[in-house]
């Protein structure tokens, strides 16, 4: 039967640079790790945030193409993804623990140095608009929208999205700026992996690119 973590009892509470709280649990079963940055902000705080991190998947840096980045993550046996919800955003890096420092350095480089790709943005907008058109023909999604309306009224998390006009007119640099700025906001880190707490904090302090003082989370819409 599954065992659920009690964060206060089962995880050590550490502190990294910039007073970032770190919840630590050592993995004694294998050589894999998962490192998660948790931000208590999401689409309710900035309706463009989800689109920005959808865009990240297609971006390179000033000296690496998207294909080169993917190839390097593959070589390191590590993966990443960013999952922005309405109220919380999870930035997740995972893979082979011995390569975590190199993977973290690469991932932090991407977050800090992602470069605009106009063609990729145009394709992303096309995909988003097509998905919205398809959703209108999906009875289940229409019912979900109806339930949202009944619960929240005309303004809800489901309606708090970039409009077609906003997507088409947006300069993709605005999305890239959001990616660059994400680590500047207050957040906490969760780690599950083989590293000792001392080694983990040393890795975070060396590679996590954050200012000395983190910014407060911007106010969000309440529904």
Range-by-range predicted roles:
Residues 13, 23, 79-81:
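Short, surface-exposed charged micro-motifs
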Residues 1-4, 17-48, 186, 212-223:
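His/Glu-based metal-binding/catalytic segments typifying zinc-dependent metallopeptidases
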Residues 160, 185-223:
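An aromatic/glycine/proline-enriched structural segment found at the starts
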Residues 116-123, 214-217:
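Conserved short beta-strand edge segments in small beta-sheet-based binding/regulatory domains
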Residues 3-17, 168-170:
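Extended non-catalytic domains of envelope/secretory-pathway proteins
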Residues 29-57, 61-113, 124-133, 138-169, ...:
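M16 family metallopeptidases and their MPP-like homologs
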């Amino acid at each position: 039967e599954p065992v659920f973590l009690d964060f206060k009892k089962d995880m050590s509470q550490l502190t990294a640079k910039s007073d970032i709280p770190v919840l630590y649990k050592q993995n004694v079963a294998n050589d894999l790790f998962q490192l998660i940055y948790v931000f208590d902000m999401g689409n309710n705080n900035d309706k463009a945030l989800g689109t920005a991190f959808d865009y990240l998947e297609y971006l390179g840096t000033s000296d690496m193409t998207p294909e080169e980045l993917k190839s390097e993550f593959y070589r390191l046996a590590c993966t990443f993804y960013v999952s922005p919800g309405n109220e919380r955003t999870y930035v997740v890096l995972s893979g082979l623990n011995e390569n975590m420092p190199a993977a973290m350095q690469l991932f932090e480089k991407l977050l800090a140095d992602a470069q605009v790709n106009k063609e990729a943005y145009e394709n992303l907008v096309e995909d988003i608009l097509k998905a919205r058109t398809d959703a209108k023909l999906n009875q289940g999604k229409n019912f979900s929208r109806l339930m949202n309306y009944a619960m929240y009224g005309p303004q809800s998390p489901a309606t708090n999205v970039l409009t077609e006009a906003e997507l088409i007119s947006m300069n993709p640099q605005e999305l890239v700026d959001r990616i660059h700025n994400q680590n500047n906001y207050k957040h906490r880190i969760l780690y599950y992996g083989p590293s000792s707490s001392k080694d983990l904090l040393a890795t975070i302090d060396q590679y996590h690119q954050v200012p000395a003082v983190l910014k407060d989370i911007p106010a969000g819409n309440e529904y």
